[in-house]
């Protein structure tokens, strides 16, 4: 709880033992404003969410065993031969019917004389619960709980656990109670035996014995002691629930001579108050024959699993008691799925109105073969009439033919006539879908749209609520999907479809034109200006710029015309012009170099990984301006001292560390990437953002938002990763976290305390203050991201850094993003091939394998790979070499093109500079410790002014300075610049012998300063004025034809032969040399301040009192590079 009495979402989810997503969903249902897991809400709102979540968990609480209420027959559902329970569908209560204690009916001889005793009979259709007191029905022998003697109707459970299809008819009044009949003599006393419903085909058997397959028999009402209940703990919901039949049990009254059951009168439609037991995902629809192993009373297979129920029960109206109007008793049983491939067309009969069927996807269990007789022939299930229904295939969500499509309410289903042909003139349900598909020229091979068949589907959706309602809606929609039609029926399509096909042939070209016009019209109508545009190669044509700005090219040409530039649509514009035009339209411009490097271009998780994903540690990149305390913050997290050992106290590499912390009582790992903050290391920061899952933006509380802070924000946005702001140095004087929040809000980063969604944590790295809170926020943010990877595949990842070690050879820092990297794996990193010889982590501990989100240093590459390239492990070296060869040729062509572009100089400009003597070149050979440093130095050299001095880098590579480098420098007159590297044996001696200048640096600041000084040294020096002093004319003396000015030196000094300017008022009357300087009739070289002297010039004699003489001299000065 916060100090203001509010509660965070993640604290509320922790109290309730739920995920943050569930609490956020509940808040959204209650219209409570909560943007993320760390949002704050009031205690009242928290109480509403708690009550809603507790109400949503009530059905789960009701599933626990409780003492049954008087008059309720609580039944347990358990598969025979299994010790575990599975939830079962509650059965509708019999309205106002009281029945005596029933016992399993004694088996009688089957009526069919053709059936031998040894052959197991196929289970028949389940009997519905009867309203008569003399006949009770249950799909299978239930296991009975305790029940009081009083017989009361069982109350209906809440519709949340068993949504039913409601029918808009008046409610049926309760039926009159039927007097209870006396129980047979064999029944036990009422007080000693619990009451249960007896199925007519149940036979007394031991409780633990597997059920035997029953024979068709005449129902006989007897009572017997119920079987002993197994020791397994039942799970019941609400009302009496029959054990889920492994196949449809024998139907009562199905034979031709069976008596019609007594039905209590009711005004409601038949079957409106009944439901049928729920089937699992692999169960057949009611009325369909049963496969072996699923028939009622059939011995279960050894090791059978507990029955699983998929989804929620679906009411099938009229399925409870077919004798009441769903189908006349004694009639032939209709086929469960209509005309199936193995069923005669005449076997199907219409379904009663309001009947709803459900198709469910198989839940991954293998199909069960059809039942077989001992001689190997398939068993024909015995029905309840003279006709029998052959076994059919198990229905799935996508049946093989339209004959298995779900029926419409009222019994009509297209194509259900004899032979599977649809009625002539009857419009098909998916004609509109076909017309749309033909218009869009999309192939009909794909699965068609899901159509919900039924008139009262809204009532089904209305009853489906709560947290589990969304899942049930999805299952229901899939179950009612109409399947695609076979090719034979598509050929015999009605006339409208044929007309559309003819039109399609005639209008192909017109349709293409129409679609092009629609796209153009939509683009013109949209006219939405982008937030920013990214210029790929520092130039764009007018048409390309117009497309990016979503304006007409004529608008761009008009804008340029008013600026004095005559342009055409194909003319290329340089970067300043693009920025000027884009700013006129209110769109900022970004260069593509860095933003493209920060975008995540390769998806590391492939489709085959989806079944094997596990949670992986998050990768956190620490970014920010230089000297804002990024490495110190990581030191506080790791409890190490890295920053103290860095040259100049600044980070110049990407450091990869893995930290293990305690969170919610369990160890959690975080992989940190520490990026440099200096402006030269832009590419390094972009690479760090490309592989990260969350970015930590470090901002100093005493310095605020700086240029590299803005750059880091743009990197994180380009990579589309969440940002957590750490406001560091809050312990310093002058620290103002609120000022930092204000500056960040100007960059659209609004703190949660101010109503935004960005987590901002004030920390102190030096005093380790609020470090735990920062780590907790990082874990909470990454939990929402749901980071996963597949560790059971070959590794893939990114090269974070690479360098050449003189002892180990090429070394690369690899971040494994998916899979597991092992010693001996063949790795291809861009155009570089390697075989992992050894791996070490950030603590220099050797590893044999590295899982997802691990950063390791790997040895064994053939050359130094390029930082930022993706690497991938291949099963053998042959396949890896083939991939690397193609990449190497592409990289070579790209490198040559870049070199030619960098050396492209205008011949006229070069000859003009050569004639003027202004063409200066500084040749460099650059060697650094790692690839990232080489990139940073080259990028910084590109920023230096090149108007008068050209910098040519003849060679740039990671590694030590060799004797070959010295020979190249001697031949080209180059300077060797080393950065954090050493010289090989013999290189120093060769450099001294050839007079090659070798410079070594360990801080990038000093390196760039010296190179700029060397470039300025190539420039010609310039003459500048240096002030000497001033004097005032107080008297004028005429000597011959010339005149001498008697002066008093006010400031500085006067020197003989210096330059002077004579000021008279605001006008300069003379500028020239001072030829004569005397004091007391003696020639002197200079006169200091406070002395009088005589000043004479050969070319000026018009002195006047009050003139001011300014003395200066011209000196040579080293030129500076101008931008």
Swiss-Prot record:
Region ranges (G4): 728-731
Region spans: G1: 624-631
Top-rank lineage group of the source organism: Bacteria
A Pfam family reported for this protein in Swiss-Prot or TrEMBL: EF-G_D2
Biased composition (Gly residues): 320-339, 412-422
Keywords, in A-Z order: Cytoplasm, GTP-binding, Initiation factor, Nucleotide-binding, Protein biosynthesis
Record carries keyword Cytoplasm: yes
Basic and acidic residues bias (residue ranges): 425-439
Region of interest (G5), ranges: 764-766
Comp. bias regions, Pro residues: 170-187, 207-217, 258-268, 388-403
G3: annotated span: 674-677
Binding positions for GTP per the UniProt entry: 624-631, 674-678, 728-731
Chain positions covered by the region annotation G2: 649-653
Protein name stated in the entry: Translation initiation factor IF-2
Organism of origin: Synechococcus sp. (strain WH7803)
Family as reported in the entry's similarity comment: Belongs to the TRAFAC class translation factor GTPase superfamily. Classic translation factor GTPase family. IF-2 subfamily.
